């Protein structure tokens, strides 16, 4: 990556292993993550409630959602930041990483 023609080191994002993914769809627009944005992900397999995570669904598909906890069901679930979409409950949550930054095109 470059900012004003200067290389941008991965260390700019902090400590850890990072990768970028391109957001697809409108499920996270309420968190200002829009279709086509680049999302910087810190690779890790744990996350805190409230963080935006990349997780595998029961169908082994990656999804970018907010991690929340349902006290009644005593389980974690994935929450899209779009009121028109439903929460995703998975039997075995597999976190792949945590979103740390969003890069938008101007």
Locations of regions flagged by a protein language model:
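Acidic/glycine-rich C-terminal interaction modules and beta/coil loop segments
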Residues: 4-5, 11-106
């Amino acid at each position: 990556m470059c900012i004003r023609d200067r290389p941008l080191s991965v260390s700019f994002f902090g400590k850890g292993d990072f990768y970028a993914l391109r957001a697809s769809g409108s499920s996270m627009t309420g968190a200002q993550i829009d279709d086509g944005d680049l999302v910087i992900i810190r690779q890790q397999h744990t996350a805190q409630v409230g963080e935006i995570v990349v997780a595998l669904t029961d169908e082994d598909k990656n999804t970018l959602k907010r991690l929340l906890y349902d006290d009644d069901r005593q389980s974690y679930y994935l929450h899209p930041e779009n009121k028109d979409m439903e929460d995703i409950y998975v039997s075995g949550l597999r976190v792949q990483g945590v979103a740390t930054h969003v890069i938008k095109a101007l």
